[in-house]
Design a protein with these regions (language model features):
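C-terminal "cap" of GNAT-fold acetyltransferases
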Residues: 169-177, 182-183, 188-221
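Active-site rim helix/loop that mediates acceptor-substrate recognition in acyltransferases
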Residues: 35-79
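Conserved N-terminal entry element of GNAT/NAT acetyltransferase domains
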Residues: 1-51, 210-221
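Conserved GNAT acetyl-CoA-binding A-motif
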Residues: 140, 147-170
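Conserved acetyl-CoA-binding loop-helix of GNAT-fold acetyltransferases
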Residues: 123-126, 132-149
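Conserved acyl-donor/pantetheine-binding loop and adjacent beta-alpha core of acyl/acetyltransferases
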Residues: 37, 66-70, 74-78, 84, ...
Length: 221
């Protein structure tokens, strides 16, 4: 089984058209294998209009890849960051202005805290065999500096609160402790009054002026 280097360098790079195939490698056999980082970017109505709703088919997958490739080409800022260990793609983190994610905007559990124009992290994926080695935390840290360069005032994540162990399939938005270790702070607890079937989430934030703790083994370029 492949493992991330203990003493090597973890490189974190913006998603580009040439790296879309690397995202597919990361997402394979994970929660996002059929999502292609589009779950929160479209409402159900928009998914139907875009031809990506319903059961996954080869046509659906090709269409989702096409949409992610289009996002990777935009000039105002990458749609995410890709992590590499010794040149091997090992992680992907979705990133962008909150307005890029209609499903987040509509979510009661992830409602806006204030009027700060934040960027958000709706999904974090690390390949099997590379988990538990700090890849996710390094990617979260990297979002703050990257978003700041693009003019973002802050970055937010909507994490599972600390406490009961979270299954990997339910941790795609990260955990509270993960964000804390990346230098984020909790600015709101679980929204009260939500239906029991809602996934509990806490809002974590780092401002552009925050200096997240960085690892000497990771770099972004």
């Amino acid at each position: 089984m492949a493992t991330a280097p203990r003493n090597g360098t973890l490189e974190i790079r913006p998603l580009t058209l040439s790296r879309v195939a690397d995202v597919r490698i990361v997402l394979a056999s994970t929660f996002g294998s059929q999502c292609w980082d589009l779950f929160f970017r479209f409402t159900d109505e928009q998914k139907r209009a875009a031809g990506i709703a319903g059961k996954m088919t080869p046509e659906h997958e090709a269409r989702r890849k096409e949409i992610l490739a289009k996002l990777a080409r935009r000039k105002r800022g990458s749609a995410g960051l890709v992590a590499y260990a010794d040149g091997e793609p090992v992680g992907y983190i979705s990133l962008g202005p909150r307005s890029d994610y209609p499903a987040v905007e509509r979510s009661r559990s992830m409602s806006a805290v204030d009027d700060v124009p934040v960027w958000v992290i709706p999904c974090i994926t690390v390949r099997r065999g590379y988990r538990g080695r700090g890849v996710a935390i390094a990617m979260i840290q990297a979002t703050v500096a990257y978003a700041a360069k693009k003019g973002a005032a802050a970055v937010e994540g909507y994490a599972r609160p600390d406490g009961k162990r979270v299954h990997d399939g339910s941790a795609h938005m990260g955990t509270e402790s993960m964000f804390r270790r990346a230098g984020f702070r909790r600015i709101r607890g679980v929204v009260p009054g939500l239906p029991r079937y809602y996934t509990p989430r806490v809002t974590m934030r780092a401002t552009s002026g925050t200096k997240p703790r960085t690892s000497s083994q990771s770099r972004t370029r």
